[in-house]
Amino acid sequence: MESILILDDDAANLQGIADVLRSEHYSVIEASTGSQAIENGKSCGPISLFVTDMDLPRSSGTDIALKLVASNPNLPVLFISGTPMAWWTNRDLSNFKRFPANRVDFIEKPFSLTQLLVRVRNLIQRTLQPRTESGFQAA
């Protein structure tokens, strides 16, 4: 069973995403702060996917993802935001280029449960493919 770490400071969003993923038989680890996500990433065994809100109170989803990927280079990341991806890439392009293109995706709020599940499945499947290039590629 794939294990998914979710980071969102909004309790309703965190619970909603967790419930949907659990209904699809994923093992879910929840975190409401960046430090909690990093600790869970270290202590909860192998993580198949990291799902994170981009805009967090004391850090960014990008910063937390980079810390997790530093210790697990094959970890795929799904970024979630109500702000368009173009804004984030213009603001933080150098950091996005540090993620392998085939192991990162972005979904903009509001999104459907189907959209979320398709992106989760695709990212987990991509981890089985060999690493080919670096850089951010929006799907």
Task: Annotate each PLM feature.
Residues 10, 54-55:
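The short loop immediately C-terminal to the conserved phospho-acceptor aspartate in CheY-like receiver
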Residues 10-14, 113:
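Short acidic/polar segment at the start of the alpha1 helix of CheY-like receiver
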Residues 14, 57, 85:
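The feature encodes the CheY-like receiver
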Residues 15-23:
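Charged docking surfaces used in two-component/phosphorelay signaling
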Residues 30-49:
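Acidic, metal-coordinating helix/loop segments flanking the phosphotransfer/catalytic sites
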Residues 53, 81:
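Active-site residues of response regulator receiver
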Residues 63, 67, 83-108, 114, ...:
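Alpha4 helix (beta4-alpha4-beta5 surface) of REC/receiver domains from two-component response regulators
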